[in-house]
Amino acid sequence: MKIVFITPTTGLRRVPLYRAGGHVYGQYNSITGPLILGGILKRAGHEVEVYEELNGSVNYKKLLKDTDVFCFSVITSTAPRAYELADMIHEKSGARVLMGGMHVTAMPQEALEHADQVITGEGEKVILDVVEGRIKDRLVAGIPIEDLDEVPFPDYSILKTQVEAANVLSTRGCPFRCTFCTTSRMFAPYRQRSVDNVIEELRMYKKLGFKYMNFEDDNFTADKERAKEICRRMIAEGLVFKETFFFGRTDMANDEELLNLLSEAHLTRVLIGIESLNQKSLDSIHKGQNINDIRRAGEACVKHGIRLIASVVLGLDDDTEEDIKRSVDFAKDIHAYQLQPAVLTPYPGTPVYKQMVAENRMIDDLNWSSYDMMSVVFQPKNMSPWNLQELFYKMGKYFYDFKTSKLIGKLFGREYGVRRWIFALYTRLGVFGAHIASHVKGSPFWKIKNTAWMFADKAASADAEKSTATA
């Protein structure tokens, strides 16, 4: 059989200009799931191709002619696109459609309206039986893998869209339980691969000629001693790439040996969740860090030549507009290389989603494609949805000023100063595009801008229900 894996993306992200901007942010890379699952099917004798819409065009007209099974990896923001493609496939061919991923794990019945079968959770142990028809249930529960060393390495030979950086997932899950995060719920419990197994995968990528690498772990430095050992082995065995990206936490700043090893092993770009400079907000999301940790982490990263991507969550219940501005000011003060402002997004299956639904605070008129951490999909406590949406763009524009590009160039090198200047340009293009969209009736931004009536109606309905109940 011919099996095609598709990682869909939203409409804007398929625009060449957006793809070019994403390339400035980081190297083209592909999520590991389809490459692992596809490799399992390939070794069983099937013809397999993997496509990532974010990284290139997909010729569906050609694929429809000879594909037996389409497999979609779905997150919340890409669900409408996945459903659209699934419906088109059913209309124009006899191919089967399978779906898996974070969103369909949380919303399986919704996905079954478009897919022939849905796999929830981890799919490695069931994918072959599902594809070959031995498992016929429409809803298939994946089986968590206890020993991650049993998971085969991603097979990049089946990837048909462009790639520059290899992705390594050395753990699954996260030992922390932030209330807005889907990972610790999709991939529980937290598990680690052995250091030997990780190093073996890195050797493969060196042989394949990759110059860039990403650790996909939600927190690569959660186990500091393990992270140190991986770095030592990378250095000793010549497995140092031009640049390796990773996710970290503020507490890595407390370990000088770890910071030195990260730098020497070229793990020189890190995303750290600052989230907020309001301690009450940090405590409310169970972040487990304090403001002093955040400052130390920023200073330590600059000292060791590690470029910090500061992630700030906008719209937490205890945060005011001033708190958000203070967080972005702080990111500038510690010379963060990039800012990732993320609008609080209530993803299905998370405590935040349950809270927002229970409190009747969701913007009902938006579909899943707006759940992209760039769009406001709920009623914040301390401002209107549109105020928060405007803050998202204002803070990005404020952080990415052209003048700071020169300083970044001095701190990290000319290449990164130029990239920072391009970030500033693209941010302004994005702000301008959002401004135009907010005036187009029916667009997501227009809906966010005009939601006051909705929440007034909701409040009136709630009051009416209370009156009826007490009568």
Predicted regions and their residues:
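Structural detector of well-ordered beta-strand residues that form the stable sheet scaffold
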Residues: 98-99, 119, 140, 245, ...
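Radical SAM enzyme core and accessory elements
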Residues: 2-5, 12, 17, 42-47, ...
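Catalytic cores of alpha/beta
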Residues: 108-113, 318-332
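Radical SAM [4Fe-4S] cluster-binding motif and immediate context
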Residues: 152-309, 316, 329
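Cofactor-binding loop segments of dinucleotide-utilizing enzymes, especially the Rossmann-like FAD-
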Residues: 8, 53, 102, 218, ...
